[in-house]
Amino acid sequence: MKFGSLLGLSLVGLSVASPVTNVWKSPRAADDFIRGVNLGGWLVLEPWITPGIFEEGGDSAVDEWTLSAALGHRAHERLKLHWNTFMEQKDFDRIKGAGLTHVRIPIGYWAVAPIQGEPFVQGQVDMLDAAIDWARHSGLKVNVDLHGAPGSQNGFDNSGRLGPANWQKGDTVAQTYKALDVLIQRYAKKDGVVDEINLINEPFPQAGIQVEPLKDYYRQGAAKVKSANPNVAVVISDAFMGPSKWNGFDVGAKTIIDTHHYQVFSPQLVAMDINQHVKAACDFGNDELAKSSIPAIVGEWCGALTDCTQYLNGRHEGARYDGTHKDSDPKTAVPNGCVRKTGGSASQLTDEEKTNTRRYIEAQLDSFSKGHGWFWWTWKTERGSPGWDLNDLLSNGLFPQPLDSRMFLGQCN
């Protein structure tokens, strides 16, 4: 969960839509349209989602690797407590009750194919097994997402290890196939529940990942999934290039391309006003999703208009919005702008902030109808995170219920 799409970010404003309660009709109302949510921070840990666990590990704990090392012999017991309590059947029931169809469950290679000498602990697959049972009981389908690869495919903390992207070096790709093989053998034949297997999350060419070897990995990974169960979709990442850049790429299997859309991970993005955020969201659907020859899903997105959530940019990083991040632009930063926004509930937002959040969410829902579906990031957080915590947004009426209800109709027309 980093960077996201920087496409279509024209700074031309829109007029504000008049608030009306109405029903919006998707141009793609097919039964296979995905409306899902990520279970982030559960089986792959992230500091901003569960800050308390990382704080227990001290200042050195900035990702799951360093957290596990810092906790030492206590790591397995502490993480097992988290795995066993963070998500339950009642969460899946509430997700289904909100009109969603899928959950995307991130998991790291270390959970299924640990490498000797690394500090990670295991036990996550027991809860992934439980999650599939919960999904079956609730009537949800599952996207199993290989979120962290050996060496790190992007250098982000959510890959398991913050730092250089060393995937594709040494034996890391071969080690990734071992992890993928376990996931496929264990889950690809869960017909009716496991709907997709995501081969790798957010490989990042700008960090040194080579695209041609990535394509080879996609082809071989897709062949493995297809051999196990041709009905399970293979999900490939657009690698921050935009889905239309992959037009014509064929892995020889039922394929979905995954793109992520965030508008908070640069000074230019957090400086935009609500009209510009809405326009950027609408442009993304028209410029990328509608032009993709491969069925495209927005595998991660949110309603955040700032990067203020504590640790969102990293364990010891500030925010661009208020000027406390090293990459901030002092010309556009808002001093003290993150007051009331670092955590807690969306209920504490001002009326204007609530309206803007709802409007931005609706625009994205409308825009993403140009694709094959979406997965919101993320279902819940430990301390709350306005704009990210879907469970909280639902409770505060900032996420449409039912999903096709609109207060701001026709924003992307």
Curated annotation (Swiss-Prot):
Pfam families: Cellulase. One of its GO terms (biological process) is cell wall organization. It comes from the Eukaryota. Induction: Expression is down-regulated in presence of human keratinocytes. Its main location: secreted. One of its GO terms (cellular component) is extracellular region. It is found in: Secreted; Secreted, Cell wall. SUPFAM superfamilies: (Trans)glycosidases. Residues 1-17 form the signal peptide. Keywords: Cell adhesion, Cell wall, Cell wall biogenesis/degradation, Disulfide bond, Glycosidase, Hydrolase, Secreted, Signal, Transferase. Disulfide bonds join 282-412. InterPro entries: Glyco_hydro_5, Glycoside_hydrolase_SF, Glycosyl_hydrolase_5. Substrate binds at residues 46, 202, 262. The active site is at residues 202, 300. Its EC number is 2.4.1.-, 3.2.1.58. PANTHER family: GLUCAN 1,3-BETA-GLUCOSIDASE I_II-RELATED, GLUCAN ENDO-1,6-BETA-GLUCOSIDASE B. Monomer. Major glucan 1,3-beta-glucosidase required for cell wall integrity. Beta-glucanases participate in the metabolism of beta-glucan, the main structural component of the cell wall. Can also function biosynthetically as a transglycosylase. Functions to deliver glucan from the cell to the extracellular matrix. Involved in cell-substrate and cell-cell adhesion. Belongs to the glycosyl hydrolase 5 (cellulase A) family. This is Probable glucan 1,3-beta-glucosidase ARB_04467.
